[in-house]
């Protein structure tokens, strides 16, 4: 009971001082039904919300298919308007059919355009600007590139500079080198006069005003009359419009037009003749035709495919014989550059000598000495053979000259003497010449027999003719005569046999193409251009031979066989 009383007291305290007014509405209820309302909503529409009822806040469900169709139609109309009103993509690409070259975009390229790519760093010739390939093309040398002969001139230190230059040299007597701003002890500076000492009459006609040439241009005298400008009401504004009466055309303003001026209005777009530039009305005025307008007979030349292009241009033509069309940078197969070798002979590391290696070294030294001795013997024999051949040729030439002199001194053969059998020479050419001389002598002797009873003068004439004929034949046959000394062929044959035996002793030889250092005790080392002898081809990749007095294995692809 006490609790209930406390609650009532609290509620009374809360409502104390507040007046609560309740409004009573006597109007119609919001939930009253309209007397004219017709409930035309079916049970299905009411349940699924398929119809909109005004005032109820209930909306009809959305038809997705109809919405999609409406959106598509609106999108099509918007796109058509944008295409009609917006910028056309064909402008700048040659027009509608791509033939209006004057409207083509400069940055638009066709299918025939070939972009020039920059070369890779491995293909760029970096020697340009440094004198070419061998550094001798001075016209291509970079201006900032200096060679080893360049000597840079460094600036002198402040303590090394000669500061007397510009002051007349070391002793001050070189007047042409004196600094213009440097003055000597004889210089006298002129100080400016004070304001009270200046003559201000200059520029006003001198001291008495009679020096007209010294009068200031802006200084006027008492006789000067200044002309003041007229007032706006006193100015004559007809100037520039033909004067007072408009008849002075030379004073008329160029921009001022009269009543007789007829302005030529620009034609409307529908009145302009757009046939100009396309050959006129009938397309036959070629001088008025637009250069970028092409007709139906125009055939555009397309760029050839990569497989159809002739890449032989610049390399001497199709068969490489047109030297005037050859590329300057194109090298032929005969322009073979010989590689320069920067090879330095390496010294093989000698192994620790032991008993076996010392014995082997002794044997190798003996073989090397033998090879050098054989080479010296062959060179000595070759020199002796050349000397003997030269001596024998000199003796044969001397004998031939003696025989020719003896023939000239001997008289013609007598009829009683029998012809002696001529010696058979070793040379066939010399044999023919001697037989020809003997035959001619026999004929001359028969002529002498028939002319026994003739006078002695005829006989002498015949003898002189015979000597002339013999001398002529000797002159003809002497340069072509070939001599052989008896026994020389056998001697040459013996020497050739000696060389064959020497070559057989060396066996198969080869020359080294590269350097090779022995990797083991059973291998040999050699340098480029060394000769390897007594080669045994024990395998396709490894052979055995002698080089520098050592016998061992070496790779076969490092050497080249000698013929």
UniProtKB/Swiss-Prot annotation:
The SH3 motif may mediate binding to the cytoskeleton. This is Src substrate protein p85. One of its GO terms (cellular component) is site of polarized growth. Keywords: Cell junction, Cell membrane, Cell projection, Coated pit, Coiled coil, Cytoplasm, Cytoskeleton, Endocytosis, Endoplasmic reticulum, Membrane, Phosphoprotein, Repeat, SH3 domain, Synapse. Contributes to the organization of the actin cytoskeleton and cell shape. Plays a role in the formation of lamellipodia and in cell migration. Plays a role in the regulation of neuron morphology, axon growth and formation of neuronal growth cones, and may play a role in the regulation of neuronal spine density. Plays a role in focal adhesion assembly and turnover. Plays a role in intracellular protein transport and endocytosis, and in modulating the levels of potassium channels present at the cell membrane. Plays a role in endocytosis via clathrin-coated pits. Residues 331-477 are annotated as: Disordered. Acetylated. Residues 349-410 form a coiled coil. Residues 505-563 form the SH3 domain. One of its GO terms (molecular function) is actin filament binding. Its main location: cytoplasm. Residues 366-405 have a biased composition (Basic and acidic residues). It is found in: Cytoplasm, Cytoskeleton; Cell projection, Lamellipodium; Cell projection, Ruffle; Cell projection, Dendrite. The lineage of its organism: Eukaryota, Metazoa, Chordata, Craniata, Vertebrata. Cortactin repeats lie at residues 89-125, 126-162, 163-199, 200-236, 237-273, 274-310, 311-333. InterPro entries: Cortactin_SH3, Hs1_Cortactin, SH3-like_dom_sf, SH3_domain. One of its GO terms (biological process) is actin cytoskeleton organization.
């Amino acid at each position: 009971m006490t609790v209930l009383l406390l609650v009532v007291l609290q509620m009374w305290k809360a409502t104390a001082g507040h007046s609560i007014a309740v409004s009573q509405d006597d109007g119609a209820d919001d939930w009253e039904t309209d007397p004219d309302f017709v409930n035309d909503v079916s049970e299905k529409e009411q349940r699924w919300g398929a119809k909109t009822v005004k005032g109820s806040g209930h909306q009809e469900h959305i038809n997705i298919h109809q919405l999609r169709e409406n959106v598509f139609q609106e999108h099509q109309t918007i796109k058509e308007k944008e295409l009609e009103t917006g910028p056309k993509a064909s402008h700048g690409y040659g027009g509608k059919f791509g033939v209006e070259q004057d409207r083509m975009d400069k940055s638009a390229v066709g299918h025939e355009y070939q972009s020039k790519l920059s070369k890779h760093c491995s293909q760029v010739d970096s020697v340009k600007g440094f004198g070419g390939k061998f550094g001798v093309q001075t016209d291509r040398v970079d201006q900032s590139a200096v060679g080893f002969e360049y000597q840079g001139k460094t600036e002198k230190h402040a303590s090394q500079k000669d500061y007397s230059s510009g002051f007349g040299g070391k002793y001050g007597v070189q007047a042409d080198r004196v600094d213009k701003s440097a003055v000597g002890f004889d210089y006298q500076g002129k100080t400016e006069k004070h304001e009270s000492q200046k003559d201000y009459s200059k520029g006003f006609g001198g001291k008495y005003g009679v020096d007209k040439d010294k009068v200031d241009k802006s200084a006027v005298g008492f006789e000067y009359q200044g002309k003041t400008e007229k007032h706006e009401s006193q100015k004559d504004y007809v100037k520039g419009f033909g004067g007072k009466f408009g008849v002075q055309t030379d004073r008329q303003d160029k921009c001022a037009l009269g009543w007789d001026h007829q302005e030529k209005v620009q034609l409307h777009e529908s009145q302009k003749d757009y046939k100009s530039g396309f050959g006129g009305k009938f397309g036959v005025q070629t001088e008025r035709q637009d250069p970028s307008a092409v007709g139906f007979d125009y055939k555009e030349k397309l760029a050839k495919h990569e497989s159809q292009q002739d890449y032989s241009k610049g390399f001497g033509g199709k068969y490489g014989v047109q030297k005037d069309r050859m590329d300057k940078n194109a090298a032929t197969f005969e322009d073979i550059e010989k590689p320069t070798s920067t090879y330095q002979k390496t010294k093989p590391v000698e192994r620790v000598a032991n008993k076996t290696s010392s014995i082997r070294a002794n044997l190798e030294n003996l073989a090397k000495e033998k090879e050098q001795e054989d080479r010296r013997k062959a060179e000595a024999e070759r020199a002796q053979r050349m000397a003997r051949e030269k001596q024998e040729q000199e003796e044969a030439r001397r004998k031939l000259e003696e025989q020719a002199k003896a023939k000239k001194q001997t008289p013609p053969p007598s009829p009683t003497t029998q012809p002696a059998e001529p010696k058979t020479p070793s040379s066939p050419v010399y044999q023919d010449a001697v037989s020809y001389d003997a035959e001619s002598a026999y004929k001359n002797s028969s002529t002498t027999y028939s002319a026994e009873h003739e006078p002695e003068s005829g006989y002498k004439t015949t003898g002189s003719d015979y000597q002339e004929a013999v001398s002529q034949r000797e002159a003809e046959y002497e340069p072509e005569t070939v001599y052989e000394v008896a026994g020389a062929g056998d001697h040459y044959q013996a020497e050739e046999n000696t060389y064959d035996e020497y070559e057989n002793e060396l066996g198969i030889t080869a020359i080294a193409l590269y350097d090779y250092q022995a990797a083991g005790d059973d291998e040999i080392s050699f340098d480029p251009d060394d000769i390897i002898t007594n080669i045994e081809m024990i395998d396709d990749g490894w052979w055995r031979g002698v080089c520098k007095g050592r016998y061992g294995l070496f790779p076969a692809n490092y050497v080249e066989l000698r013929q």
